[in-house]
Amino acid sequence: MSIKIAPESNKISSLEVVVCRPLYTESLILDVVDTSRIEGEILNTEHVRSSIAKKLGLEHSEFIQTPRHIDGIVDVILDATQNFERTLTKERLLGWHHSLFQSGYSGYTPIDVAQYRTGGMKVISGNFGKEKIHFIAPAADKVPLEMDSFLEWINNDQEHDLVLKALIAHFWF
């Protein structure tokens, strides 16, 4: 099997479909499952597999009814990986947020969906009364300007390749 990458587009220009499709599908399944695991959510791999197969139009011997939140996570991962060359906009990001929190809740906590946050945000760990603060996010009133700056950079930076931009974006927020 030969793999040719067109340097001007960072795209694989030829692969055997017989090998590529199953590898791509398994990679997507791992992306969805592992991304969710990082956030503390353990997903049923067969639900993820079925959702991906349906959305990609693949034949799958056991299509099963998938929970709405799994379909939402799959939608986000598919959009991010298949449409990475599209401009990243506020509307697209908020659409992803809506896909992830379709119920309007994060656990048992109601949240404002598909809009920038309006309150404070901290990343903490530890038991109640012994919390450790790892990060305090910028004030809510600064979020629109910070997001505009980020979107300007992510869409217009030509200095960095896509992998490095993804790493920088991860640390930006």
Language model features with spans:
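FIC/Doc superfamily catalytic core
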Residues: 1-173
